[in-house]
Amino acid sequence: MGLEEQLPGGILLSTVEKVAGYVRKNSLWPATFGLACCAIEMMATAGPRFDIARFGMERFSATPRQADLMIVAGRVSQKMAPVLRQIYDQMAEPKWVLAMGVCASSGGMFNNYAIVQGVDHVVPVDIYLPGCPPRPEMLLHAILKLHEKIQQMPLGINRERAIAEAEEAALLARPTIEMRGLLR
């Protein structure tokens, strides 16, 4: 006989983290950060056919101070990397990053000195979305996966510790331009 059976009807038991996660996942405001071809598919996702507003993303925010999700859509050049980091630092907590497309995830076909070989070398990434370019349906699926991740995310000091560990791992990772393998 649990506590739920002893309580009168109409009482809901939950934790603060679950309630906060539910509210956060349904009110994301993405920042506009389209860098290449993937940005076209990201814009199509906001159109009437796919209607990203169904998932709480009523509008794309033009200022990082009002955004809590950065969708990096496309390749990131070495000159754009500091700007990307500055925009990420200006976003208020809690914030999440989605790497959209192969170029944002791993540099894509641009394996040279001018392109960052994965945006995770600049900012911590929460969700990687493969494809060249990924379809709007795939972006919606990635957003739903991010919703699941947000709902399970801890609050307070536990979240700060998780963010610090992710950023430390990103900074210590060896750049893929320096890796040697079958193609180099």
Curated annotation (Swiss-Prot):
Cofactor details (free text): Binds 1 [4Fe-4S] cluster.
GO molecular function: 4 iron, 4 sulfur cluster binding; iron ion binding; NADH dehydrogenase (ubiquinone) activity; NADH:ubiquinone reductase (non-electrogenic) activity; quinone binding
Reaction catalysis annotation: a quinone + NADH + 5 H(+)(in) = a quinol + NAD(+) + 4 H(+)(out)
Gene Ontology CC: one annotated term: plasma membrane
Subcellular location(s) of the protein: Cell membrane
Enzyme's top EC category: translocase
GO biological process per UniProt: aerobic respiration; electron transport coupled proton transport
Keywords: 4Fe-4S, Cell membrane, Iron, Iron-sulfur, Membrane, Metal-binding, NAD, Quinone, Translocase, Transport
Annotated membrane topology: Peripheral membrane protein
List of residues binding [4Fe-4S] cluster: 37-38, 103, 132
Cofactor: [4Fe-4S] cluster
Keyword Chaperone attached: no
Enzyme Commission designation: 7.1.1.-
Function (record text): NDH-1 shuttles electrons from NADH, via FMN and iron-sulfur (Fe-S) centers, to quinones in the respiratory chain. The immediate electron acceptor for the enzyme in this species is believed to be a menaquinone. Couples the redox reaction to proton translocation (for every two electrons transferred, four hydrogen ions are translocated across the cytoplasmic membrane), and thus conserves the redox energy in a proton gradient.
Family from the record: Belongs to the complex I 20 kDa subunit family.
PANTHER family documented for this protein: NADH DEHYDROGENASE (PTHR11995), NADH DEHYDROGENASE [UBIQUINONE] IRON-SULFUR PROTEIN 7, MITOCHONDRIAL (PTHR11995:SF14)
Subunit structure: NDH-1 is composed of 14 different subunits. Subunits NuoB, C, D, E, F, and G constitute the peripheral sector of the complex.
Name of the protein described by the UniProt record: NADH-quinone oxidoreductase subunit B
Annotated source species: Mycobacterium tuberculosis (strain ATCC 25177 / H37Ra)
Gene of this entry: nuoB
